[in-house]
Swiss-Prot record:
It comes from Escherichia coli (strain B / BL21-DE3). This is Ureidoacrylate amidohydrolase RutB. CDD domains: cysteine_hydrolases (cd00431). Induction: Up-regulated by the nitrogen regulatory protein C (NtrC also called GlnG) and repressed by RutR. One of its GO terms (molecular function) is hydrolase activity, acting on carbon-nitrogen (but not peptide) bonds, in linear amides. Keywords: Hydrolase.
Amino acid sequence: MTTLTARPEAITFDPQQSALIVVDMQNAYATPGGYLDLAGFDVSTTRPVIANIQTAVTAARAAGMLIIWFQNGWDEQYVEAGGPGSPNFHKSNALKTMRKQPQLQGKLLAKGSWDYQLVDELVPQPGDIVLPKPRYSGFFNTPLDSILRSRGIRHLVFTGIATNVCVESTLRDGFFLEYFGVVLEDATHQAGPEFAQKAALFNIETFFGWVSDVETFCDALSPTSFAHIA
């Protein structure tokens, strides 16, 4: 068992019965020219987040944790995105951006596109699981719950973008399904102003889970390994 220093209190878990969740580290969310950038969100400070996720993934894999990568998006015709009868049609900033800029139609969050791809620095390895998801929550219309329960996994460590949207949505849904969720705050990035990051982390540590950081996580898994990994 491993005890991780976190807010509001430490949490103990078995790494081999836990998963590291990497949420939507796609060009869409972390790279200039991707969806978030084109929709007017600031992605200029995502590079340190990518590096921190690399470090967390390396440590988690060495400790025997399952690594799950999410990719948010839809088919090329956007059927999976939902039509006017879906709130997603009206609230998705990707869909709204494409309606405002028709030349982008088929380029944002479409499976097979550059936008949909994971950033070059983050490459899933054999044994990892890569899951597409059609909405903010990684539990909605995906096999995530079944995958975790079949492996006896109850503790989830979250990284990725955006803290206040898909990361928080997935962690909240996990809370309702009796999963223990931890966010590594320096391995996440918000969509919107800095206060959105702070508010999401406040919500998580106060109501839904725990908040820690990459160095503390790596030290908890192997106290002597962090310097080597970094």
